[in-house]
Amino acid sequence: MALRPGAGSGGGGAAGAGAGSAGGGGFMFPVAGGIRPPQAGLMPMQQQGFPMVSVMQPNMQGIMGMNYSSQMSQGPIAMQAGIPMGPMPAAGMPYLGQAPFLGMRPPGPQYTPDMQKQFAEEQQKRFEQQQKLLEEERKRRQFEEQKQKLRLLSSVKPKTGEKSRDDALEAIKGNLDGFSRDAKMHPTPASHPKKPGPSLEEKFLVSCDISTSGQEQIKLNTSEVGHKALGPGSSKKYPSLMASNGVAVDGCVSGTTTAEAENTSDQNLSIEESGVGVFPSQDPAQPRMPPWIYNESLVPDAYKKILETTMTPTGIDTAKLYPILMSSGLPRETLGQIWALANRTTPGKLTKEELYTVLAMIAVTQRGVPAMSPDALNQFPAAPIPTLSGFSMTLPTPVSQPTVIPSGPAGSMPLSLGQPVMGINLVGPVGGAAAQASSGFIPTYPANQVVKPEEDDFQDFQDASKSGSLDDSFSDFQELPASSKTSNSQHGNSAPSLLMPLPGTKALPSMDKYAVFKGIAADKSSENTVPPGDPGDKYSAFRELEQTAENKPLGESFAEFRSAGTDDGFTDFKTADSVSPLEPPTKDKTFPPSFPSGTIQQKQQTQVKNPLNLADLDMFSSVNCSSEKPLSFSAVFSTSKSVSTPQSTGSAATMTALAATKTSSLADDFGEFSLFGEYSGLAPVGEQDDFADFMAFSNSSISSEQKPDDKYDALKEEASPVPLTSNVGSTVKGGQNSTAASTKYDVFRQLSLEGSGLGVEDLKDNTPSGKSDDDFADFHSSKFSSINSDKSLGEKAVAFRHTKEDSASVKSLDLPSIGGSSVGKEDSEDALSVQFDMKLADVGGDLKHVMSDSSLDLPTVSGQHPPAADIEDLKYAAFGSYSSNFAVSTLTSYDWSDRDDATQGRKLSPFVLSAGSGSPSATSILQKKETSFGSSENITMTSLSKVTTFVSEDALPETTFPALASFKDTIPQTSEQKEYENRDYKDFTKQDLPTAERSQEATCPSPASSGASQETPNECSDDFGEFQSEKPKISKFDFLVATSQSKMKSSEEMIKSELATFDLSVQGSHKRSLSLGDKEISRSSPSPALEQPFRDRSNTLNEKPALPVIRDKYKDLTGEVEENERYAYEWQRCLGSALNVIKKANDTLNGISSSSVCTEVIQSAQGMEYLLGVVEVYRVTKRVELGIKATAVCSEKLQQLLKDIDKVWNNLIGFMSLATLTPDENSLDFSSCMLRPGIKNAQELACGVCLLNVDSRSRKEEKPAEEHPKKAFNSETDSFKLAYGGHQYHASCANFWINCVEPKPPGLVLPDLL
């Protein structure tokens, strides 16, 4: 996104499209056109539910954060990418209008129809009011923004290529962290109320306005949005959004994203949001917080009670709060995400308002509506009461959820025409969740007001340039499809029209989507050259980085399109499918009939998706796509159309097959996908199924799976900031679509590359791919979905990465990986990760707890852990991939995919192939899931593999299956390549690859064999490895990574260490199991992350404490053992681990060839955070050294270790002096802490690790004379002591031990001989 300063003006592909549309000019425009957001939005809506779709289109866009691209496409795309330009405001507006719905929509399920109706009405009123305000605001702002955008565009336009990218990179590099963090930090808290609309707009604006900053912002925004969307989208959104995959995200995003967007927007554009109280967003808490958070009289007693319980003179005691929060039953990663979203003041400690926010978000999340951003809480008139088993007081207040639903219902009424069906369908299929989704969903779509406003907004937007532009652009681009699309689009714009046409259109869109994919794929290939220029900003770099530059754009575009398109279209479709078996048939019927037109729509959808993607990552891609897409669409469209029409004709067959496949074939394929389907709801339509999967995921078991997909969508959306948006959905879809979509991609690519005939063959091959997909179907079922999701994630990650990388925020790029680790991108990534976690949490307890350790510990890890359940695996896969792999594997997947795609829709091909080879992958993923840690990466890898496979497939369209086999083998490299590419985009990736590969190989040296699946596992491990690898690989980024990680760790670790320390006694085992996987993996690649050790440490702290184990161990420890030997043994291990940590830090810093880079790394927040962690480790060694002396335990090995540690430490001090981090000698002098024989309770006071007095701190405080020694324990973590297994520990000792030595503290006893 950031990459596309010119295009997105800070948006990204989507932004670019919007911008292009508005001011981005032709360049952007293609994206807009390609994106065809309005239509795309329409598409997705259509897909979601025919009736719903039509209405949804306008509103859906608003409704779906993801779909964000749909109407947002016009607006959203603009919003995300270029929308800020002309359309952006409109989009923003529509978005805004929908934002409320979005936010509200998810809760639907929990309320009765009457309640929903009431809510809907209330929401409608509110919405109408807001709409009026927003309308004025929007118009006013639109002018300003457009002016600005045009200005920016005119100034940035020339730079769209490398320059823009460089600028964006510079800006992002400079501001990404701050921005991301800022956006994340502030927007989240502050993006609550009415802000959504304007904020989004603002966001769009920012996107547009701030060419560099904006891009950054967009990036952040998207990221934020993605994150937010992710959480809410997944839980909240998805159920509702079920109907609209895109919508799911958008719902999430709309509410969350919108809020998030607003946040970011607010932050960045707070100025711009004149009437919307943008600034508050920067004021993280208050402005956007609902009154019941800061108004004491409105705060529920339950909240107050918890506050009283946890409040201490020094503030809220995290240790006391932890068990209460854990009693919510939410996965730790989810709680970690909520925490990360709410904790804006003091890392590790919550303020009263933040506590209320956390409780409210937990309550919302428990209702199945991921509270991915505090802003979402504004939808609740009253504070939602969380259900905390540890707290009798808290009773859930259904009303709060209704608040969300109202928006849905509000829309619902307007949408009643088509929406009711959808809503009903949704409800039916979704079941409870469906109901929620449907009501929320329908409402959202229904938000006719929204629709109308959106329509109006949209029209304005269109008038503004986006909608018209997009539409026209699309038309122009699509040429054929253009007219149909335009009409569709317009229909989409006009809810009523769309409503009617929606069904047909929907099918069309589905087809269209693929058409788009195909077209894009084909055109992309053909237009590759152009895209590089366009997407060139981002892609160009990537493309250039990757030889497949064009392919990549294609790939990315495709992936994203597929993601977006597929996602959007299919999600919608699926939603329809998922939503109701009826719909799918309708869709099916519609699909074939509308295929021709559907193709167009599909394109639109794709474009929408693209926009989404664009908005996400593919903003570039989108732009890419858009320029390519238009051609693609046109060319492919024609092909597609012709192909499409004769569903079974070779090319047409392929297209239609794809489309139809999606519908029928895919329905079959996707029936399997349906399998995938665990999200069986998806079965009805293949691609729809994909979406259905998404939807189903979202809603049901499918909900679960769908959620993952949806989550992905949300994730996408969330990650969208990254490449989250379409990618995720796309991935799932891609996976399912993969055959169709990827085939489409391949086919289209091939079509465009090789022509219709080839396209047909390709399609056929791809269709086999589709069959393969079927093969994958099973694979897909569990794995493909995950892979797809993964891919989406991967794409997203890639996109994210691209964005980051392109943003010149390599660190960002890496950080994303780290971010996955929840480090560098603490805010964005962490939030992302958290959101992912949240989503995962939404997805399922399995994922949650799978992820929980990791999540908290390592969002990335959590991402990796996620693959605990099959569906969850998918979810997680995408999710996990997203978070951890998101940066790495996912990125890899995506990136590679993109790359491949760029090289001919390879991405899809690989995807498909992967899917084909995916069976093992699926298994792998599942297995990996079990690996908890590995699984995430596995999934990611799978995604990668898949992508790779697809790539191969693309390469060998005709020998698709063979390709699968051979590509499987290649996959490892592809995966690796991908990873590399993601990493470095080839060069970087190559370096990375080794790390990834190394991890991979280490984990699964036979990635080639199972290519996707094994690689995935490896990669999963690799993910960590990758993370770690990444870390090492980042030499230059090492710091960033490290800092990122450490940073994450610092706040995360602090929380973790607090939580973990608490965890030690409380949640150790739960955390541990997951964390252990993480840790194992982390540990397996310990050197890769010095930071990681810390991070890992926190992880481990959380994860490792296995209470039972510890107790057993304690039994052994406390038992009469050869004390001296045991002390020597335990300390030897401790010092050995500490030496590794310190050495890793030293080697990492020594490995940075450039002193300026090294200094920058060390002085960065993350670098300092990391080094402080190393200092803590060193301080632990100093304490242990005293313990060794005190107990007179002598051993050559210990002496040698201490010497080595001091030697490395002295070397490391030189680096620390660069950041004034060199610890005061006194802080390393713990002699005052030594327990002497005469001391009473000496054994009770002795730390189980170092045998020093755990209370020495307070004692020092009593003795001012020992001011300096007091410093030894004056860090925040020093103030913690933990009691575990009958022993007390210094928090830092226990933390280090658990994270770096083993999960169970040693429980050493002070010898009596003293």
Curated annotation (Swiss-Prot):
Residues 115-155 form a coiled coil. Residues 178-199, 460-498, 972-1026, 1073-1102 are annotated as: Disordered. GO terms for biological process: endocytosis; intracellular protein transport. Residues 666-678 are annotated as: Interaction with AP1G1, AP1G2 and GGA1. A motif (DFXDF motif 2) lies at residues 690-694. The keyword Membrane applies. Keywords: Acetylation, Coiled coil, Cytoplasm, Cytoplasmic vesicle, Endocytosis, Golgi apparatus, Membrane, Phosphoprotein, Protein transport, Repeat, Transport. InterPro entries: EF-hand-dom_pair, EH_dom, SYNRG. Residues 518-786 are annotated as: Interaction with AP1G1. The modification N6-acetyllysine is found at K513, K744. Changing R1183H: Found in a consanguineous family with intellectual disability; uncertain significance. The modification Phosphothreonine is found at T1100. PANTHER family: AP1 GAMMA SUBUNIT BINDING PROTEIN 1 (PTHR15463), SYNERGIN GAMMA (PTHR15463:SF2). Self-associates. Interacts with GGA1 (via GAE domain). Interacts with GGA2 and GGA3. Interacts with AP1G1 (via GAE domain), a subunit of adapter protein complex AP-1. Interacts with AP1G2 (via GAE domain) a subunit of adapter protein complex AP-1. Component of the aftiphilin/p200/gamma-synergin complex, at least composed of AFTPH/aftiphilin, HEATR5B/p200a and SYNRG/gamma-synergin, which plays a role in the AP1G1/AP-1-mediated trafficking of transferrin from early to recycling endosomes. Within the complex interacts with AFTPH/aftiphilin and HEATR5B/p200a; the interactions are direct. Plays a role in endocytosis and/or membrane trafficking at the trans-Golgi network (TGN). May act by linking the adapter protein complex AP-1 to other proteins. Component of clathrin-coated vesicles. Component of the aftiphilin/p200/gamma-synergin complex, which plays roles in AP1G1/AP-1-mediated protein trafficking including the trafficking of transferrin from early to recycling endosomes, and the membrane trafficking of furin and the lysosomal enzyme cathepsin D between the trans-Golgi network (TGN) and endosomes. This is Synergin gamma. It comes from Homo sapiens.
